[in-house]
Amino acid sequence: MKKVGMHRMKFLSPALVTGANGFVGGHLVEALARQNVKVKLLVRSTSKIPFKPTTNMEICYGDVTDLESLRKAMKGVKVVYHLAGILRGSNFSSYRSVNAEGTRKVCQAAAENKVKRLVYVSSLSAAGPSTEKGPIDETTVPKPVSFYGQTKLMGEEIALSYKKHYPVTVLRPGAVYGPRETDIFEYFKMVAGGLVVIGGADTQKISFVYVDDLVDAILLAAHSKKAEGKTYFVSDGQSYHWGDITAYIGKALNKSYVTLKLPLGLVKMVASAGDFIANLTGKSILPPIVSSDKMKEAQVPGWACKNTKLRQELGFKPKVGIEAGIQKTVEAYRTAGWIR
């Protein structure tokens, strides 16, 4: 199928983006603004916007757990891009309150305001891991292994239950990387420092997608009739070991490094200690990728998915391969002063 160019697309406007100050949300907001879409940014009052707002952006202070703030933000909105969620919580309830019940409130407010379309950006974690047999696809029965994945799946089910009110599309991206990303950035930082610490065996195969390609997929999903009521995986179509990724990062940085493999049991102990301190103090001392919940995702064969359905039905064609994407990301990190 021939891809519909973004320049030929009639964009729905105004749009509301939840999680607009986040990594993917910020890139989506900027892409919409470039297309002269009026964008409402739902952010908390304490949040920092990682880019300079333009005249066609409106900042709406609120929270996905606050129905009244959602109702107010959605007045006059035609399309909702729901990206808000939490990657790290203290228990199952904390994940559910945002990823599931927050999604319910977003969908309810959208229905009350008679929006025309909703795209829910979920996660590969909602589907569960791939196996030794290879990448999973949309026919695979979801078997999430973490609280994060379980509650994102709950969010998917809630969003799709509102399709009688407006068309809904669910996207499940693999690992997303690019400028301003802060979790996978830890690997870039380790390579830059010359020491890469890996917990357990480097045997998992993982699907990645560059942030600009994910934004393209989100916009395609929001403006395609074929996407209504459907779920799609989003990736660059390949899968990689973490060793491959660190090698590409080393090449982009022109840095040599040493890899230190720690027993998974030790990493789990560190993650548990970090969770305990976070629950006690309310402050996290470890990055989100090092948590007890994420350790559940580290003990499976892989996180690889196919993008065949997205390509065939919506004409999705990723523009940025892994090496080029990592090079772009390194350049952005250096420009921002995050790494040398």
Language-model segments: what does each one mean?
Residues 2-3, 305, 309-313, 317-340:
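Amphipathic terminal alpha-helices
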Residues 15-35:
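N-terminal Rossmann NAD(P)H-binding glycine-rich loop of SDR-like oxidoreductase domains
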Residues 61-101, 109, 124-129:
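NAD(P)H-binding glycine-rich loop region in Rossmannoid oxidoreductase-like domains
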Residues 97, 131-176, 196-200:
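Catalytic helix-loop patch of NAD(P)-dependent Rossmann-fold dehydrogenases
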Residues 101-147, 169:
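Conserved Rossmann-fold NAD(P)-dependent oxidoreductase catalytic core, especially the SDR/UDP-sugar
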Residues 150, 154, 181-186, 200-222, ...:
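Substrate-positioning beta->alpha
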Residues 211, 247, 270-279, 285-316:
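Conserved C-terminal active-site "lid" loop/helix of NAD(P)H-dependent oxidoreductases
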Residues 220, 224-289, 327-328, 340:
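Mid/C-terminal beta-alpha module of Rossmann-like enzyme folds, strongest
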